[in-house]
Curated annotation (Swiss-Prot):
Pathway: Metabolic intermediate biosynthesis; chorismate biosynthesis; chorismate from D-erythrose 4-phosphate and phosphoenolpyruvate: step 4/7. NADP(+) binds at E80, G130, A131, G132, G133, A134, N154, R155, T156, H157, A158, K159, M213, G237. Its EC number is 1.1.1.25. This is Shikimate dehydrogenase (NADP(+)). It is an enzyme of class 1 (oxidoreductase). It catalyses: shikimate + NADP(+) = 3-dehydroshikimate + NADPH + H(+).
């Protein structure tokens, strides 16, 4: 059995995950060796897979689709962020043997926007497209940055209204949207199949940044749509991915990685 600190990402599917490469770069910055693996848990077998991992020397884990809600249920303790998000993407085994769950997605998004792209969230008007778990997970941290206004919209308006009530933000039907948004964040899953949110091109006319929470080819349709209709800057979610990973790494090891060189490294792969 390895004596190196062991970490893993759990998902299904998970073979595509870039987390091992990212965390390897963080370990190089810290000057340590770690082991980081991908674990594809069976649907219905997540809890057992996590239990086995920690019982055999695991120190910390990332959790991706479709297990973030199960990870929340599995955790013995939760951070305030995780409680607000209702989902967990980071697990750490505490010295007392309990599992603590955290959610670093919002930190990853906010740090990419404010620190890497140097765009302030404070006093800005933000539009969130989508009302699923990905969007819910980032709202608490966005609110901490004190934007002037957060508007949420979704194909099924009732879901947007539900999150609006939960977090004290505004819900507006997609058909009623027009311009006036500084930052537009796409958290819908349509890009994975090339589909665009059913919004007017007019929403981008005042847009400083259009951001897709997914990365790579899946983000291209939305980003091209935004840029061609007036968005000053567009970005996929690679920086969010690296940023949330860095926050997880800090929770596990107390070391804060510099995300900028890792983002550039991942772009070059």
């Amino acid at each position: 059995m390895t004596t190196l600190p062991r970490y893993a990402v759990f998902g299904n599917p998970v073979a595509h995950s870039k987390s091992p490469q990212i965390h390897r770069q963080f370990a190089l910055q810290e000057g340590v060796d770690i082991e980081y693996e991908r674990i594809c848990a069976d649907i219905g077998g997540f809890a057992q897979a996590v239990s086995t991992f920690f019982e055999t020397g695991g120190c910390g884990a990332n959790v991706t689709v479709p297990f973030k809600q199960e990870a929340f249920d599995l955790a013995d303790e939760h951070s305030e962020r995780a409680l607000a998000a209702g989902a967990v993407n980071t697990l750490i085994l505490l010295k007392n043997g309990k599992l603590r769950g955290d959610n670093t997605d919002g930190i990853g998004l906010a740090n990419d926007i404010t620190q890497v792209k140097n765009i302030a969230i404070e006093d800005k008007t933000i539009l969130l497209l989508g009302a699923g778990g990905a969007v819910r997970g980032v709202i608490p941290v966005l609110k901490e940055h004190r934007p002037a206004r957060i508007v949420i919209t979704n194909r099924t308006h009732a879901k947007a209204e539900e999150l609006a009530r939960l977090f004290g933000i505004e819900a507006v039907p997609m058909a009623d949207l027009n311009g006036g948004f500084d930052i537009i964040i796409n958290g819908t899953s349509g890009g994975l199949s090339g589909q665009l949110p059913a919004v007017s091109p007019e929403i981008f006319r005042d847009c400083r940044l259009a951001y897709d929470m997914v990365y790579g080819e899946a983000a291209l349709a939305f980003l091209n749509f935004a840029q061609s209709n007036g968005a000053a800057e567009v970005s996929d979610g690679l920086g969010m991915l690296v940023g949330q990973a860095a926050a997880s790494y800090h929770i596990w090891r107390g070391f804060t990685p510099d995300i900028r060189p890792v983002i550039e490294y991942m772009k070059a792969l």
